[in-house]
């Protein structure tokens, strides 16, 4: 078992020690490159880890959910299902709208996915209804991703139809053109149109039908090519008054003649300028508004996108009338910037604390300046590499640099402490620097590569979690590598020029007092260590008990996925009885808005009622609650949510579901709560049987809260049961019946008005204000084969039935999603386990499959790979240490320190009430790399003492422990203080940073206390084992 012999001539550091100018200029180059890189790096909340996601929306006004599913969604799904690289396809078919969300594999470029989607839509065109008003429209956006910015446009003098027209033509188009913007949606549904409201009684009295009116309007308003005349000397383009532009022109349209007298449209209908869809509405606070939600493209830089929007807004608002007001209600980048600023402050605090601890130990200003230069240089230099790797300044990379503060200073401390020891013995500074740097060079290399080895498994983590922590791991590894370079170049060079016997011996009262304190501590440690070495088996039992305890703690600690962040925005869903109308829902929404706006933490509120790409039915409403900045409110988001739900519970007939927006969005659909669980079947009937049973059981579990389902099968349906024989005798087809119903109740888009700026629709419907409710069906008239008018009631009966309000698919099969939250006193792991146990008690049939979705599915995947991740880190470190030490045994001695770190981290998390989530797990993996440093420093010097001074293993390890006690304590405290700002974090995004700090501080404290005693004992035990093994082999050889 040999190690590389330390060099007494400076080793790789010699060149840099002897050439101070070249070394200084090299470090200046690293510093300048880092500063330039820092200024060039984009800022974001988290690394870009979005799945390539595309949303396809098809609108078919008046179509029932069943028609939308069979006629629109299913043909599209069949084509989309043939695309390569598709990870998941979900769809939602509701009244008049089909929304299909396509999530592709992480490795597939978004542009490639877009091409495949466009080709699939083209292939499905001939399979879609011929009267579809518009073809399917796709957007490169994840509908579950909260908007980066929400704007409200209001006016005190103009109707909402004119406001929306201006917003759509002047504002939304310009914002959509900004790089990084994926989709601009206008909520409020006030797009201008000419609405024709037929008077059913008047039509019937004149012997007309709605189909007669529709045919007359479509024939009177056309916009087609007419040709041109090409004469001998000039060409003339043909044009005609074939377009009608205003409601007044339509009002004067002659639709028929009776007894020679014209019947104009205005005689049988109310014709007016109105909204294209009267069942849509949006509000900003209490004022009706057009709400613009701006969503980014997956992978786009959120900060630069938001900045571009804000820069454009003044120019856009200048083009609007003075009565129109544009208000930015929410901007996610505000909290992102605040979170990044807080993390940067914690990084500076970590640097300051580390420098302070260095001075406390070295008690010398020149000796403190040296690592004080090395630390920021290593961190700043990392920014240059981050630019080339297309990284960003985000919470995770800044957390990596904050943690790196404690790591990178270790190398400089070890070098300085070793060089100082020789200077204090009387060596000249230059000779001491050469000797000390050469002696410690191998230790620095061992520390560096064994620590980087721990990070290697993070690079191979799969799926979105792996992508998420790749930037973290690489950033930390780069900082550690640069630190090693600085410690072997700049640090010994500065020691040779700045340290001297006089400077090291110069002491003040503080220096003398601290020196005595450290001497007493080392003496006490020496006495304790001697006792421990005399009772090795007792110490070994303590080490083994920490291993057992760490396993037990791992089993019983609450487990989660990702910390719930307070980003100042709450997404809400308001649910009313399934038969609620738009008018009823809008009234309930305003009642809820009044209650929410009274909360002192709420700054603004936007709400939306109606069916569109995100809202599936008329009995639900979407809300976005924007909270005041964190420093202006007393409570964090979870307490605000609990308070709002309690207040809204007093509003009768509604259920409110709230969840805070998160920087990490894995879901592909807008959910009522944070977590989802799906049931998938081959038929809707199977879901209708088992969903209520499972819901009943889940709602009784204390580990779950806000349990709800998107299964809504009690929507009222007026089923028109046509007597086909009677209809056939009269020459009336089912197409005639459908057309008559569609004309009356479908807000049918029957014609288009073309202008230079935009296109507007003509909407046909019955005036239900004259004959409201189901009685309106009695006014429907059909034309028989002999030209007579036949009441619908003579050939059909109307039955009231129940049907789903929306039909959801997952990978082309019917699915229902059960949403839930987790109460504060339980963890996501508890909830997942209870759901799986409950599912087993139901004995679901084989044709029903269940699966967690979104972040819950990612949690299961991360939890399943965590143990293997830790094993991989340990194995990687063993291999590196084995290669460096040319030994199978010494790496085991070093790795024996790891259980103590796990025990400390898990205990700290449990005491602090934190879950074991992916952030905390990363902390534990980092601890694996930190705590083994103690053992490396002990074993390196013990092996050198055995080899060079001929000491016995016991004397060698005892001396090594006392000799390296101060640098071990110093490096551990430096790492601990580097993590301390994260643990004590209270600002924006603190929820994300705190678990990492808690785990590392707890692990470092426990491991520091235990490994100082267990490592030398285990070293001696393995040394004895090695001698026994050698003697056995020698005996066998002699016998042979």
Swiss-Prot record:
Membrane topology field: Multi-pass membrane protein
Keyword Cell inner membrane: yes
SUPFAM superfamilies: Multidrug efflux transporter AcrB pore domain, PN1, PN2, PC1 and PC2 subdomains, Multidrug efflux transporter AcrB TolC docking domain, DN and DC subdomains, Multidrug efflux transporter AcrB transmembrane domain
Pfam families assigned: ACR_tran
Top-rank lineage group of the source organism: Bacteria
Any one GO cellular component localisation term in the record: plasma membrane
Oligomer status and interactors: Part of a tripartite efflux system composed of MdtA, MdtB and MdtC. MdtB forms a heteromultimer with MdtC.
Name this polypeptide is given: Multidrug resistance protein MdtB
